[in-house]
């Protein structure tokens, strides 16, 4: 099995849009619903290699808030937006507010990152 497995999206009324990433060989419900921080970081590392972009939703289940990470000309663009996420998207993982903040801080230190206005304000906090 390929280490980075994007799981197909599933719609659940109770949870809203459910899309998860897992690097685990054995995929079970816990892996799908609660990816580890290392899974998220591993996925981010793969963005310029295997994927053009990655969406990370955060905060409460069903929340439309997310981080959009895109690799472009050897730079990363981190955006915060609230579009309708279609079911055709499979590169989405839900993370906690803290992990979202960690991504902003740590990823910005390690890479050339272009931030939108929302994340510039978040970085100041």
Model-predicted regions and their roles:
Residues 2-35, 41-125:
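Acidic, proline/glycine-rich low-complexity IDRs
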């Amino acid at each position: 099995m390929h280490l980075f497995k994007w799981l197909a999206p599933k719609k659940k009324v109770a949870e809203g849009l459910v899309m998860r990433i897992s690097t685990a060989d054995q995929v079970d419900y816990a892996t799908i619903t609660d990816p580890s921080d290392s899974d998220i970081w591993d996925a981010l590392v793969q963005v310029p290699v295997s994927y053009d972009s990655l969406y990370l939703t955060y905060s409460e289940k069903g929340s439309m808030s997310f981080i959009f990470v895109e690799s472009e000309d050897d730079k990363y663009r981190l955006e915060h937006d609230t579009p309708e996420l279609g079911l055709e998207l499979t590169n989405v993982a839900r993370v906690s507010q803290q992990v979202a903040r960690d991504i902003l801080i740590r990823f910005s230190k390690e890479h050339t990152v272009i931030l939108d206005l929302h994340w510039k304000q978040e970085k100041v906090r």
